[in-house]
Amino acid sequence: MSSAAQPMSRRARRRAARRALGSQPGTSGGMVIPVSFVVSGATSADFVTYHSLYSRLAAYNGDLWIRRVAVRVTGSVAKRMGKYAFFEGLAVDKSQILSAAHARPYVYGLPSTLSLPGGRRQVKDFQSINLFFLLDGTAHAGEFAAGTFYFEFEGSPNVDFPRDSEGSNQAVEKFYLEHINA
């Protein structure tokens, strides 16, 4: 895990996630679980994509649904992030991100909340749903971002997330910056 991520107790992480999502415990009937990510090694690009195989979580609960995602990012790339949006697949250009009805501006240092296109989505759908950020300027090789996605779930409250190599009780997914040809 990146040194940028500060260790928090599970209870503190969930409180922070609920605040980021604007929901209070017990009001939504769902649950909030944070997933950390680290991205690095970009080639020159004016927008980036973060993606990972969240479909593997479906093996723990095929009826698990995601309603909203809050994003908090730090690092050299994060300071220049603009609008962001989810899309099916990777064939996306800048104009699609700018014009997407569900796109939101990213405010550095603050959690930004984004509802999924079409409402709630099953976790297994995330094998083809990717998050795109526009950048002010370009990302270069060696730049990085680190942070957390806070996922608001519907489904079983007893999902057993896989442990990372350090034995953490939160799932740690590796993301990467990738040059996308518009």
From Swiss-Prot:
It comes from the Viruses. The keyword Magnesium does not apply. Disulfide bonds: none annotated. Transmembrane segments: none annotated. GO terms for cellular component: ribonucleoprotein complex; T=3 icosahedral viral capsid; viral nucleocapsid. Keywords: Capsid protein, Ribonucleoprotein, RNA-binding, T=3 icosahedral capsid protein, Viral nucleoprotein, Virion. It is found in: Virion. The keyword Ribonucleoprotein applies. GO terms for molecular function: RNA binding. Residues 1-25 are annotated as: Disordered. Capsid protein self-assembles to form a quasi-spherical capsid, about 26 nm, or bacilliform. This is Capsid protein. The lineage of its organism: Viruses, Riboviria, Orthornavirae, Kitrinoviricota, Alsuviricetes.
